[in-house]
C-alpha cells in the first residue's frame, strides 16, 4: 500500500539541491503521493523530527545524524549530496588561510580572547569547530556561542558581539552584505571530504517502500547534476524558490563550495567515519558506530554506478 504523503526535511541553507527539486511537480507524479517539504534551522532539529516520526526523508549533515543514530533514531544515509560545506568568515582585520599558508592553527590563534559563533550543538559546523578548538587547546582562550538560527551569527558579527563565524557558504555571503568581512578559512581547508549533507530515509520507509528510495534518488541525481554542471541555471531556479535571496547572491554561494554528487564515495564514507571518531572523543556519542550503522549503499549504487563527481576539474 502506497503512502498518501511523504514529508521531506531540508535546511535553510540555499546551496542544497532540494530547492531545485521543490519546483519539480514530476516528483509528486512519479511517486504518486503528496509531498510535504519541511524547513529546519539546524540538523539536530531534523533529527528530532525523525525521532518523532514526523519525517520520511531528510537532507542533512552526517554528524547530527550520527548522534541521532547512536541514540536509536531509525534513519539511514542512502546517498550523498555535497562535501566540504563548512567555512569560517570574519572581519577583514583578520588574516585568511591564504595569507597564513593554509595553517588553521595560525588563523584561529588570531581569535584568542574573542568569541566565534557557530550553528547548533551537534551540527557539522559545531563539530568541526570543536575538533580544532580541542586540537589546539583553545578551550579557555576562544569563546564559542551556538546558534539555533545560523543567520543571527552574521547579525551578531555586525553588532560586534562576535569576531567571526563558522557555518555554511551562505553565512559568508550574508556576512559580506552586512559588514566588511571575508573568508578566513575556505571549505577545502577545514575538513577533507566533510559530508556536509546526505540523503536520509526513515528505516520504516526503506523497508516498506524501497521503490520510493530509488525513484527519489533518480530525481536527486538530476538536481545535483544541474547544480554541478550548470550553476548559473541552478542559481536562477534556487532564487525562484528562496525568496530572500537573488540570483547573484546564490551564484556566489554556490561558487564557494561546488563539490556536488550523490555518490557515497570512499572519501565521503572515510570522512564520515573520521567524524565518528571525533564525536566519540569529544563526548557527543558514547558508542563508536560502524559503517553499516550509518549507510545503506544498495540504492545509490543502482542510481549512480559511475565514479563520483566530488573532485573539481
For the regions a protein language model found, what residue spans apply to each?
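Short, glycine-/small- and polar/acidic-enriched structural segments
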Residues: 2-136, 144, 163, 169, ...
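Alpha-helical structural context
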Residues: 30, 135-136, 178, 241, ...
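Pocket-lining segment of extracytoplasmic ligand-binding domains
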Residues: 152-240
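Secondary-structure end/capping motifs
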Residues: 209-286
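Conserved C-terminal helix/tail region of periplasmic/extracytoplasmic solute-binding proteins
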Residues: 279-313
Amino acid at each position: 500500500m502506497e503512502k498518501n504523503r511523504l514529508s521531506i526535511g531540508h535546511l535553510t541553507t540555499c546551496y542544497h539541491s532540494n530547492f531545485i527539486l521543490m519546483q519539480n511537480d514530476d516528483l509528486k507524479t512519479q511517486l504518486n503521493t503528496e509531498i510535504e517539504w519541511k524547513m529546519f534551522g539546524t540538523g539536530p532539529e531534523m533529527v528530532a523530527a525523525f525521532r518523532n516520526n514526523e519525517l520520511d526523508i531528510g537532507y542533512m549533515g552526517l554528524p547530527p545524524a550520527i548522534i541521532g543514530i547512536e541514540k536509536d533514531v531509525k534513519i539511514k544515509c542512502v546517498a550523498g549530496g555535497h562535501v566540504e560545506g563548512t567555512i569560517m568568515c570574519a572581519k577583514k582585520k583578520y588574516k585568511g588561510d591564504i595569507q597564513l599558508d593554509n595553517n588553521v592553527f595560525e588563523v584561529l590563534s588570531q581569535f584568542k580572547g574573542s568569541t566565534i559563533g557557530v550553528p547548533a550543538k551537534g551540527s557539522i559546523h559545531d563539530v568541526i569547530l570543536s575538533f580544532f578548538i580541542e586540537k589546539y587547546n583553545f578551550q579557555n582562550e576562544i569563546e564559542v556561542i551556538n546558534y539555533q538560527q545560523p543567520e543571527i551569527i552574521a547579525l551578531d558579527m555586525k553588532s560586534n558581539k562576535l569576531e567571526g563565524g563558522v557555518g555554511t557558504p551562505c553565512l559568508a555571503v550574508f556576512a559580506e552584505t552586512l559588514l566588511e568581512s571575508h573568508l578566513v578559512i575556505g571549505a577545502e581547508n577545514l575538513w577533507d571530504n566533510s559530508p556536509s549533507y546526505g540523503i536520509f530515509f526513515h528505516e520504516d520507509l526503506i523497508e516498506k517502500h524501497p521503490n520510493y528510495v530509488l525513484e527519489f534518488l533518480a530525481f536527486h541525481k538530476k538536481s545535483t547534476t544541474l547544480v554541478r554542471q550548470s550553476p548559473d541555471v541552478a542559481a536562477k531556479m534556487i532564487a525562484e524558490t528562496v525568496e530572500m535571496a537573488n540570483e547573484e547572491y546564490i551564484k556566489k554561494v554556490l561558487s564557494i563550495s561546488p563539490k556536488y554528487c550523490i555518490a557515497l564515495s570512499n572519501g565521503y564514507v572515510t570522512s564520515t567515519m573520521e567524524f565518528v571518531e571525533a564525536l566519540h572523543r569529544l563526548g557527543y556519542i558514547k558508542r563508536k558506530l560502524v559503517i553499516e550503522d550509518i549507510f545503506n549503499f544498495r540504492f545509490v549504487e543502482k542510481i549512480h554506478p559511475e565514479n563520483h563527481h566530488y573532485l573539481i576539474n
